Amino acid sequence: METVLEIKGLCKSYGDFELRNLNLSLEKGTLTGFIGPNGAGKTTTIKSILNMIALDAGTIRILGMDSVSGDLEIKSKLGIVLDDGHFYEDLTLKKMKNLIAPMYPVWNEGAYQSYMEKFSLPEEKKIKDLSRGMRMKYALVLALSHEAELFILDEPTSGLDPL
């Protein structure tokens, strides 16, 4: 099997919090979730994987590349949904998509339009006018529209209505 994510000896500390010597290996085709109480290190681990915070120690390899030296190439192959969004509030959904889509080597406009319709997301609405659930749906639409090789989702159902 092909390893898509490998973490060795990850250490990160903030004040009273310490993530110590985390080791993890994920094979292609597996579905894995982090479950634990608030403050257990789930989001810290995800932010470490995404090279959003500096590690105190350890290494992370994603899709065979070092997470630091291969950062841009790796991110072009990831479908990412973060709990805190990271969108430009004053842009419409369409303008945000037009800003994001060119960053990916592959963008599937048909998939994007299909997901926008399925999730009832109006392209002309500004991001600041979306509910938390609608923002999550939009983040999922973007993550699913560029044929990602690996998905990293931080609380992707937060704010979503139950089915």
Question: What name fits each language-model region?
Answer:
Residues 2-7, 12-163:
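ABC transporter nucleotide-binding domains
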